[in-house]
Amino acid sequence: MTENNEFDVADLRREYIRGGLRRSDLTENPLELFERWLKQACEARLPDPTAMCVATVDTNGQPYQRIVLLKHYDDQGLVFYTNLGSRKAQQLAENPHISLLFPWHMLDRQVVFLGKAERLSTLEVLKYFHSRPKDSQIGAWVSQQSSRISARGVLESKFLELKQKFQQGDVPLPSFWGGFRVKFDSVEFWQGGEHRLHDRFIYQREADAWKIDRLAP
């Protein structure tokens, strides 16, 4: 507490004692280590282990962040879906550089991907869209993401209207809904350590291989 008995965030601290990260723990390909950590996050029953903070930048250099769910990953990149009229999609159209952060607090871990985002093909988007629950498909039609609305009731009324409309048959893919693949060229792994001596390793793509360096915490 401060002199005025106000809540002081500077008083909040803890030690990171869940273990370290050594070079011998690393894999040649960062995606293999990411997959291992992601599976461990799932096994630890972390809430939303696929949630990632997506950072983009507007034309004025103003950064924006939001939480989005990872939906696929492989050597080609990491995939997420969104409304193409959203702020992030519009910013990526102007500047494809992007950062993805996975914050696994309960394991004292985080992973950061840096790269460029590119639009998915309509076929890829369509395949995923129809794998979603029908109500989620309808929800994609309802929201003009980031637009201003007068009340939540506007969304709920539109949802009920469209649910009736699409009661029979498949829900068509909205033209304004799509996805991005993040082709990454840098991945940093962070593991909390005692006395704030955290372990950090960064992978950077060099031609067809990955260069690995330890970073000071």
From Swiss-Prot:
InterPro entries named in the record: Pyridox_Oxase, Pyridox_Oxase_CS, Pyridox_Oxase_N, Pyridoxamine_oxidase_dimer_C, Split_barrel_FMN-bd
Family matches, as SUPFAM superfamilies: FMN-binding split barrel
CC cofactor note: Binds 1 FMN per subunit.
Annotated keywords: Flavoprotein, FMN, Oxidoreductase, Pyridoxine biosynthesis
Reaction equations catalysed: pyridoxamine 5'-phosphate + O2 + H2O = pyridoxal 5'-phosphate + H2O2 + NH4(+); pyridoxine 5'-phosphate + O2 = pyridoxal 5'-phosphate + H2O2
Cofactor(s) the protein needs: FMN
Binding site for FMN: 66-71, 81-82, 87-88, 110, 145-146, 190, 200
GO-annotated molecular function: FMN binding; pyridoxamine phosphate oxidase activity
Pfam family, one: PNPOx_N
EC number, as in UniProt: 1.4.3.5
Pathway assigned to this chain's UniProt record: Cofactor metabolism; pyridoxal 5'-phosphate salvage; pyridoxal 5'-phosphate from pyridoxamine 5'-phosphate: step 1/1; Cofactor metabolism; pyridoxal 5'-phosphate salvage; pyridoxal 5'-phosphate from pyridoxine 5'-phosphate: step 1/1
Residues binding substrate, per UniProt: 13-16, 71, 128, 132, 136, 196-198
Family label: Belongs to the pyridoxamine 5'-phosphate oxidase family.
Subunit and partners: Homodimer.
HAMAP family attached to this UniProt entry: PdxH (MF_01629)
Purpose of the protein: Catalyzes the oxidation of either pyridoxine 5'-phosphate (PNP) or pyridoxamine 5'-phosphate (PMP) into pyridoxal 5'-phosphate (PLP).
Protein name according to UniProt: Pyridoxine/pyridoxamine 5'-phosphate oxidase
